[in-house]
């Protein structure tokens, strides 16, 4: 079974040459780029953080919701005890997450002030927001640790909108710079 990959760089797809089987050549990503890899029925995103995003992530104090996950999520896929509390990562440079919203499985994707879906109501983001991830359907904006930080009227009162993005089982190979997605 092959692995489907699509790169998202500044809002445009890039090539799929960065993937082979269950390995993602994450060291070939530039900061601010994300690759999306099909794994079974779900897709996994790997985002390379900038130096500024890494510093900001390391300063994060965590959330009471970090260890919670939706009841519909398979219990064998979460929680992962090997990710750092602040960055929610195996290594600070990369954030690896399932592309589905913890609310209802809607798609979560990369967003930046330079490019976004202009047909969507983003008034809840206010001014000065940074690149991060967004669930357009439920109006939830996540920082680069995958924690929700802004909510629109559709999700503000939903407890599931307070949950962080879900992290797949994976490991980082320091010698090659590859991320390996682990299947259960």
Protein language model annotation of sequence segments:
Residues 62-183:
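Rieske [2Fe-2S] iron-sulfur-binding domain
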Residues 21, 34, 43, 132, ...:
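A residue-level signal for beta-strand positions that form part of recognition/binding surfaces
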Residues 20-24, 30-33, 163-171:
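Short small/polar-residue motifs
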Residues 1-30:
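General detector of N-terminal leader/presequence modules that precede the first folded domain
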Residues 30-87:
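Extracytoplasmic/periplasmic/luminal assembly and interaction segments
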């Amino acid at each position: 079974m092959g692995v489907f990959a699509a790169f998202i760089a500044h809002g445009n797809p890039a090539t799929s040459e960065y993937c082979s089987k269950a390995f993602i050549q994450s060291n070939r990503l530039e900061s601010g780029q994300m690759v999306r890899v099909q794994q079974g029925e779900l897709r996994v995103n790997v985002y390379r953080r900038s130096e500024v995003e890494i510093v900001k992530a390391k300063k994060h104090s965590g959330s009471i919701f970090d260890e919670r996950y939706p009841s519909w999520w398979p219990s064998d896929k979460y929680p992962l005890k090997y990710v750092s509390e602040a960055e929610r990562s195996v290594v600070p440079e990369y954030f690896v997450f399932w592309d589905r919203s913890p609310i209802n499985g809607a798609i979560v994707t990369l967003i930046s002030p330079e490019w976004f879906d202009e047909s969507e109501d983003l008034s809840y983001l206010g001014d000065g927001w940074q690149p991060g991830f967004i669930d357009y359907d439920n109006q939830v904006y996540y920082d680069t640790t995958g924690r929700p930080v802004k909510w629109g009227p559709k999700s503000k009162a939903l407890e599931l909108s307070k949950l962080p993005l879900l992290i797949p089982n994976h490991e980082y190979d320091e010698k090659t710079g590859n991320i390996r997605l682990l299947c259960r």
